[in-house]
């Protein structure tokens, strides 16, 4: 059912297929915890292409590949000539002749689409400018682990509503039957074509989509999600974003409005919640702020599941690689 398929964006898989993958990841997590080997990709070779730097995505793909018995090979921006001295199409054909599967984390969705088309191998999107599908598997796995189900839960995303994480949450939630509220300034709301796509899937799953500017949309949330205010490559926009998003910070006063006191707080990381990074020390010096998108109090509260969420990147990446490359017996669903 999954064999040989790429995972470039969330709509590549149906609702039932995504739910199957989430349950498969939960199973693989149990195997990992019980030290039971699961080498479904024994002696496979995996190319890990990273145009953008990464902590969780690189660590997750590397660890997942090794656990599955595969050999991961990291290819950073200084290692290959992707689109510079060699076209992406030519690179795809070369890598496809040497590797069994390819991960890509980069700047353009069109690049990962070309890799998948011309390599002839399963390609997995580790993040592009538009979508972050492997993050979504981890996010909704984490949500299911905490609530036992997904249908009819409400997730409120607060912050930069037009970045890849917001796009992916909006569409994936709509596919899976999760109500999604995006709370952001009008200038940072999801593109209309993304909203239209999400509403199409929400009609099928009977979920609700809400795009708004006020934080009152948090009251009925079961999940509160935020992300950095300035994405990689947008550093020149820092002052403008802080001005736009300062009132959208997730802090104790904001979360006290939430009716469900057992809500969970999520963040795909890294997070600027304290002064323990060089970036935040500069922010403190230039803008006199100790925290940005979330306060340290909320980030480290009992409601926060950010580190479970990060761990689940590895389990879900493992699951999608095994399902698409492992020649496993998976009944049709």
Curated annotation (Swiss-Prot):
Q: Which E.C. number(s) belong to this protein?
A: 2.1.3.3
Catalytic activity, as annotated: carbamoyl phosphate + L-ornithine = L-citrulline + phosphate + H(+)
Binding-site residues for L-ornithine, renumbered to this chain: 164, 227, 231-232
**Localization per Swiss-Prot or TrEMBL:** Cytoplasm
Q: Which PROSITE patterns match?
A: CARBAMOYLTRANSFERASE
Q: Which Gene3D superfamilies match?
A: Aspartate/ornithine carbamoyltransferase
Q: Does the keyword Transmembrane apply?
A: no
The record's keywords, sorted A to Z, are: Amino-acid biosynthesis, Arginine biosynthesis, Cytoplasm, Transferase
**Stated family:** Belongs to the aspartate/ornithine carbamoyltransferase superfamily. OTCase family.
UniProt xrefs under NCBIfam families: orni_carb_tr (TIGR00658)
Q: What is this protein called?
A: Ornithine carbamoyltransferase
Q: Which organism is it from?
A: Lactococcus lactis subsp. lactis (strain IL1403)
Upper classification of the organism = Bacteria, Bacillati, Bacillota, Bacilli, Lactobacillales
Q: Which gene encodes it?
A: argF
